[in-house]
Each structure stands twice: as structure tokens, then as C-alpha cells.
Amino acid sequence: MVDFLAENNLCGQAILRIVSRGNAIIAELLRLSDFIPAVFRLRDKTDQQKYGDIICDFSYFKGPEYYEGKLEAKPELQDLDEEFRENNIEILTRFYLAFESVHKYVVDLIRCLDDLNEGVYIQQTLETVLLNEDGKQLLCEALYLYGVMLLVIDQKMEGEVRERMLVSYYRYSAARSSADSNLDDICKLLRSTGYSSHPGAKRPTNYPESYFQRVPISSTFISMVIGRLRSDDIYNQVSAYPLPEHRSTALATQAAMLYVCLYFTPSILHTQQAKMREIVDKYFPDNWVISIYMGITVNLVEAWEPYKAAKIALNYTLDTANIREQAGRYAASVETLRPQVQQLLKEGFLREEIILDNIPKLLNCLRDCNVAIRWLMLHTAESAYDPNNKRLRQIKDQVINDSKYNPKILFQLLLDTAQFEFILKEMFKQMLAEKQLKWESYKKEGSERMMELAEVFSGVKPLTRVEKNENLQAWFREISKQIESLNYEDSTAAGRKTVQLIQALVEVQEFHQLESNLQVCQFLADTRKFLHQMIRTINIKEEVLITMQIVGDLSYAWQIIDSFTAIMQESIRANPSMVTKLRATLLKLASALDLPLLRINQVNSPDLLSVSQFYSGELVAYVRKVLQIIPESMFTSLAKIIKLQIHDIMEVPTRLDKDKLKDYSQLSARYEVAKLTHAISVFTEGILMMKTTLVGIIQVDPKQLLEDGIRKELVKRVAYALHKGLIFNPKAKPSELMPKLKEMAATMDGFYRSFEYIQDYVSIYGLKIWQEEVSRIINYNVEQECNSFLRTKIQDWQSVHQSTHIPIPKYPSVDESATFIGRLCREILRITDPKVTCYIDQLNTWYDLRTHQEVTNNRLFSEIQDTLGTFGLNGLDRLLCFMIVKELQNFLTVLQKSILKDKAVVDVFKALLTAVNPVKGIVANASKVYTNAAAKTQKIWSPYLESIMKVGQMQILRQQIANELNYSCKFDSKHLAAALDNLNKSLLSDIEAHYQDPSLPYPKEDNTLLYEITAYLEAAGIHNPLNKIYITTKRLPYFPIVNFLFLIAQLPKLQYNKSQGMACRKPADALDWAPLVLGLLTLLKQFHSRYTEQFLALIGQFIRSIMEQCTSQKIPDMPSDVVGALMFLEDYVRYTKLPRKVAEAHVPSFIFDEFRTVL
């Protein structure tokens, strides 16, 4: 029969491809289980209220029209549904493809079995495939992997969540319209089983057998697979475990497969007592906790509870006396094995000759250690026992008591065994590599010695008192030739012949009385020694390494090892050099990757890389988790050092009197600092002892691990400090903002100083790490805060700032803001609210409208710079941009949906438009026309004013931020500021030149230069927020007249004050001039410039018309509304940096020159 796995064996390749895909699917399911969007769980009330109507389970399919009708009835629900779709369709598609691949897997398996039965593969039937060793393994694995997939899905993804995800995918994707879609079949297969993985949850009836039977598989195939698993040793593992008491460990992989496959024929579990007794006697006579795939553990006591036959059969294993016997046996094993392994690990004990002479003994020791560790780890694992099940609790307590279980001792044995195994493997690999070279060198030495002896007996070579003896001369020559003729390739014959040669050399010494000559004896002894070494060397076989690999399997602990994390960390904290032993344990755990990767590799599947990366990544993440104790301990010591340096140790002045030297020495405090610093160095040394290690396919560099760990700890502590330090009480009088910022700045300075201090002791670039991580924390939090303004949110797994190795923690929100940056921004907006404060532009200061006390000034932004740095100010600026966009969008909605839809108001606009035409002219009876129009529209201006003021307020804050950024940039990095300024000016002149002459170059759309330079310019404060276009707009009817009318409706509330400019007449009106001007300016900037021109023309006409009326009626004072309008024009020109003639085009220049003198 052709090799079953050969590339030209179509049947073998077909089954191998299915099995390979099965392993890849399980890896994908495990990977995805960490990315289930929390919203699909509908755990908290807010999610239920918000998304309850758009996330449905399979009840949706009973009446889709009803659900869709509910959505269509409410536009806001439709909007939320669309937003939800945009945010989740990508991840839903990924989940759906995984679910689809599970269904496709079982369909392909059934098709392959049908092809076998129908004779598609020549000379191959189900029976012949099961007779072949590889074929038997693959068919058993194919069924087993399908069962594992179903169990993994149910364990990691709750039924309700699956249903909701499938329904959402169905609604949002085009799958329903596609004719070849098998969505119906997938839904049938993966509908909720009612199973819950939470402890204490009740098990559904007929679970999991009814779940396994949703897609019918040939019963003949199932019974034949179970037959093979029951009777054969399909992986030939027993040869690696010769002792009968190790039999169940040898067959553990097969036992796990049998456990899963039995669910496909539950009748065996229920009624066939003889078969179940046979299965338990063979596979579970001394164990009842098994690992079914990559450390997923199952307790048979619980799993087989509903099945009569299985339960009865297992009772013999669970007999109290049997449990006591097994637990006692392993307790005794641990006691004898610990000193044995520690003895073997002593420096210099494991030498080459000892290994070669004691291979069987060493392998037996390894076997005993691994079997004991396996049994104890599985049978004492917390995850294997449901704390709510009384019987399981009793069994667990009995195991722990009878085995004298001590997790620290077991962990120590695991470490020692892993280290012993690692050393033995490495030495054996080296011996295997050098085997032929050494053998040839021993052969050469032995042959040469025989030739030399031959020459001694020839009488030619002088040797004290050796007579010439031609017989011995010829005999030694012959022996030399015999040694020379030994052939390395034919090891069996060479071994036999070598033994004969050794015997001959012993005999020649006795018969020819050669003992009297010491030198001859020495030559003979040396040759015998070389021949012995040749026998030892030829016995170095690769089979030993294979046995060690089988025996050392630790895949069962893939998940339970986590329960030992605290012990590992405690050991490392006490003795950082422990990390070297830990390395061996992790390499031992990495061998678990062979299980899922073997078949994927055999078929050369492209999935190899992604599956390897997933499992290797999981393991590396665990390594990081364990070793995180080192950075944690470092930071604890650091905190103490900083405390001592700030509070206890006095700073030594540059000049110091000799007699005061003693006062400044502070020996005990300095000794404490030195001790703590030394502890930090020891921790660093500990992790760097680990050496670069290949874990799966990921290279783990200890220096990088240390740096990442330090970054992670720094991020954790800084993020927590920012979260806790920037929580404000809005009712506090005065505001807590400045004190909290000062406090936060001191905390951040403490972190910074400690980092500066530590960098040389742990060999890292402190400043670089500090800046990178703090900027990442702030940018991530800004991104999260901005998500609330975005329709398509940036998820954690999409964020460029978030990282799996160095995650930025997410904290639950304490108010409407999602993060500390949002709280800071909203607190600033609250205390500078134009309704309660008045902003004086020349002083850059806000005053309280009622008390006239200073609220805050531009020092606030210097304080934020000190606390959060440039990143913080820049992040705040970005957040304000989003808020302005939102406010402008809300404003346009109000304008379009309320104001322009109100017929009475639109009629007022029309009438006013008619009255003011032509704009260059003067309005007759102006006072009455304007007052009437303002009075008729009074009710619409309240939301309008609020939006304009908010935008203006945020623009003032953006200006202040830009000033602070620009100031600090020029101060801290003047070259960067100058370079950016020059580049900006040259780019602008190039663009202007292009508009003058289109043949000149201009950055194309695909050129990112302008976008990149903008980010730099904004970070350096080289920009004007007032010129920014925040939103795209369409043409709006009556827009200039609406804004003009809005402005003149506000003017009566204001009056000119020489000391502070335009101010509120009554504090109750709550109106601030600067935000009003800047808000209107920003709003007009979003539209075509002709709107601004028309708006300014209307103001000019208003001033001229009222002035004309006053002069004709001989009123001597200039009306306050005219003063307000003139002030508006003056400020408008000043803020926009436009030439004054823009205003003078609408108002005669003499009025501008003179109006202040008459006030």
C-alpha cells in the first residue's frame, strides 16, 4: 500500500486536509472568543435599554417583519442600528466565517466518508483506511476535532450571544440574498444549547449528545472509530511507558479522543455497561480528570453523571479506597523523586559518561516525575471541580489530604523536572550531533595504539625489556586492521565485533603474561577503554529523544498552569535567578504546540503561521504575565526611593561648611536608598539571565521583556493616577481644577524623576520610554473620548495606541465623560461657561459675572502643560475640535429643522429682506423695521445663542492652547519651531503661486505632506483655530439675514464699558461678548465667503440707517446698538486679521475713527 500521507495518495491527503483545517478552526475559535463585543452579552441595564430593540436572538426569525417594523417606526432607532452595523460588521463577519467553517468542516467530512463508501478512491474503503496506522489516526482525529469544536464554541461563546451575533450578521450582510448561502444550516447547528459555563449552572437535558447529533454523521463510521479507540494503541505510546501503572498516562491522548467521540453514540454511555467497564478499566482505572484539547479539562464524575452505564463503570475508580491508594502512591512518588532530581541537577553531576551509562535509569526518573506531576496537577485543579457540587468537593478534599498536596512542592518538582529534562535533551542533542565524529576518533585512537604495540613487539621500537615476538606483532597488526574495518553505518555488526575485540584484548593479556610490563598493559587498557566508548557512542539513539518528548508532554497544563502564577511570582520575588529554571518549564509547555501543528505542518497548510502565532502568542503573553512581578517589584522599590529622596534626604548645597557635613550625611536614609537600588539591579539581572528563547515561533528577548514589563507597569500606574487624580466635583466652590492639576503635576513629576533615576540601573532609555508611553496613554484616552462623537467608533483592536503586550487600562466612567481627558475638558468648559463668566481678551482672563472675581486665566494652560505635557494640550485641542463639530452640526439641525421650517419666522425673514434691499442703500424708518423683526423672532434665538456661545467659548480655549503650545515649542525646541514655521510659509507661498499660475507644482491628493505637516503645526501651535473649516455645508436660504437678525436681537442686552469693552447690561441675561463674536465668526467661516460679505453689508446698512435716523431726529447720543454693531465689526476685523477696509466698505471710516470719542 502507498504511504497514506504521501502527496500522491488522494484519499490520505483529503482526510489530512480536513484534520489540518480542524486544528486551525479550533485555534480561530479560541482566538475570537477574546473578541466578543461586550454589547452582545446585554449584561448591563444601559446596554439593554439602548440596544435591546436592535439585537435579537433566533426569535427574530419567527417574525422578521415585526422586528424590522419596530425599527422603521422610530428614526432614532434606525440611526442607532446603522451606527451599530458600521461598528460591528467587520468583527461579525469574522465570527460568521469561523462558524461557517465549522459547518463546512463537518459537511466535508461527511462527503469524504461518502466518497470512501462509493469507491471514489481506488482500492480504498473505510475498513482499509482504518487498518492503516496513519489512516486510523486521521479518521479518529477527524471525528474528535469536530466534537472539540462544538464543545469549545459552547464553552467560550454562550448560546444567546451566538444567536444574537448570527441574527445581526444576517440582518447586516448580503448573506440572506445569496442563493448559495448556508446560513440556515449554520443557525441550526449553532443555535443555543442552553448550556452555561458559569459555575453552578444547570446542565441541559441530553447535553451534549443532542448538540452533537444536529448534523447526522454515518453511525457505521462512528462505531468503527470508537472500536479502534477502544481496542488499539493508535499512537503507539505504550512503548514509551513500559510500566503497567503508567498505562493510563500512555493512553491519555486516546482517552480524551474516546471521551469526545462517545457523545456521538450516547447509547454506549447510557446502557452498554460491559463496554463502559472495559473503557474505564483500560483508560480511567486511576484517573477521572482529563484534558481534552490544549488544556481544556473535564471531570468525568460530573460529565458522566447523567449516563447510567458510564456512571456505574466509573464508580470503581471513584471508590474511596482506590482514590486513597492512587493519591498515596503519588504522594510517596513526590517525596522520593524530589531529592533524586535535585541530586541529578547538582552542578557537574550530569556528565556525558554518566548519561551514557544510565540512560534507562534517567528515563525512568523522568517518566515517574512527569506521571506524578500530571496526575496531581489534573486531580487538584480548581477548574476541574464545581464548588457547588458536594460530591466533587468531597473527592477533591480527599485527593488533597491523601496526597499531602502542597502546590509549592509540586511546582518545585515541575521546575526541577523541566530543568532536568532540558539539560538532558540539550546534552543528548549535542551527543547525537557529535556521535559519528567521536566514534571515528575513538576508532582511530584504538587502531593506532594496536599498531604501536605491534611495532614494540617487532624489536625495532625500543621499549624497556620487551623481547621481540613476531606472533604478537602479527596479532596486534591484525587487531588494528579489525578495529579499522569497523563500519559506523552498520551499527549492530560493529557493536558485536567491538565486544569480541575487547574480549580478545583481555585474553591476550592473560595468556601471554603481559601484565609484567606496565606500559604494554597501559596500551591495552587504553584501547579497551576506546572500544568501550565506541559501544557507548553507537548506542546514542534518537529514540531516546522521542521518548523524552512523549514523556515530557505538558499540553494538559496549558490552562491549569495559570493557577501556579502566584507561586511562580513569589519565587521570583524571593530569588530573581529562578527565572532560568522557569525558562525550562516554559519551553516544556511550548512543546504542547506540537499537538495542533503536527497535521497542519504535514499538509503544508498556509494556516501554519497564524495557528503557530496564536498559540505562541498565548504562551508569550503568559510568560509576560509571570515576569511582570519583576517590574512591579521594581516600581514598589522605586516609590520608596522617591519618597526618601523627596521627604527625607536633604539636598546638598553647592557650598558646605565642614562642621555641617555630618548633618547632611544622613547615612541611614542613604543606605536605605542604596539597598533598594541594589534590589532593583538584582531584579534586572534575574530577568536577563533567562537568555533569548524561542517560544513556539516567537523569539523572546529577555531585555525586550524587561523593557515591555517596565512600560506596562508605568502605563498601569500613570493611567491609574490620571484616572483618579482628574475627577472633579462640579458643585465645588471654587473649582477643584487648579489644585488638582498642581497635585497631578507633582505626581507626574514624581514618576518622571523615578524613571530618570532607574534608567541607568536597568539599562533602558528612560526619557524615550516616558514620552512614548505617556503620549500613548493620552492619545488613547483622547481617541476613546472622541469615540462618543464618532459614528464609526475605533475599537480597541483597531486602535494604533492600544497594545496587547502593554495594554492601556480602561476604567469605568464616573460621569458623562468616558476618560480623564473628557472630565478635564468638561471641567474647563464648566468654569469658563459664557453664561456665568465674562472673558476679557486683553488679559486672557475669565471673571465671574456676578462677583467680578477672577475665575481662571491663561496660567491654566501652562499648568496643563506641566501636568500632561504637549500631548495633553494637543489631545485637549483635538477633543475641543470634535466638540465644535458636534455643536455646529447640532446648530445646523436646529436651523434647518426648526427655524427654516417655521412659516411665520420665514415670512419675517422675507419681509426684512424686502425692506433692506438694496443693501447699499438706507432703510427707511430703520428703528421700527429692525425692532419689529427682532421682536417677532425673539423666541427662536435661545438655542441659537447657546450654540454660538459654546462654539465661541471653545474657540477661545483653542486659541489659548495654541498660544501655550507655540510658546513652549519656541522655548523648548526653537529649531523645530523655526523649521516648521519656514516650511509652513514656503508651502503656503507655493500654493498661492500655483493659484496665480496653475502650471506651477501643487501637492497632489495622494501626497500626504499637507496632512503630516498639519499635525506637526497643530502640535507646535502654529495655526489659527479661527480659520479652521470644521464641517462641510450646503447652501442655506436666508443665512446672512438670519445671522444678522440674531446679532441685532442680542445687542440690546449689551452695553459698552470703557474698562472692559462690551459687557452684559444685566447679569441675568448671561451673555459674553468674545464668545458671541468668535462663535458667529466660526459659523460664517464654514460657509462660502459671499455669506460673510452679505452679513457684514447688512450690519453696515444697520449702522448707517440708525445713524441717519438719529441725525435726522437730532438725537445727540449714539445709540448703544450702533456702538455694539461697530464694536462687532471692529472685533471681527481684528480676529480674522482682515484689512480694515473690509469694514470701511460698509461703514464710513470717520464713524470708525470717531465713535469711541463720543462714548
UniProtKB/Swiss-Prot annotation:
One of its GO terms (biological process) is endosome fission. Pfam families: Strumpellin. It is found in: Early endosome. Keywords: Endosome, Protein transport, Transport. Disruption phenotype: Morpholino knockdown of the protein induces cardiac contractile dysfunction and loss of motoneuron formation. Its main location: other. One of its GO terms (cellular component) is endosome. InterPro entries: WASH_strumpellin. The keyword Transport applies. Component of the WASH complex. PANTHER family: WASH COMPLEX SUBUNIT 5 (PTHR15691:SF6). Belongs to the strumpellin family. Acts at least in part as component of the WASH complex which seems to regulate washc1 nucleation-promoting factor (NPF) activity and is required for its membrane targeting during endosomal sorting. This is WASH complex subunit 5. It comes from Danio rerio (Zebrafish).
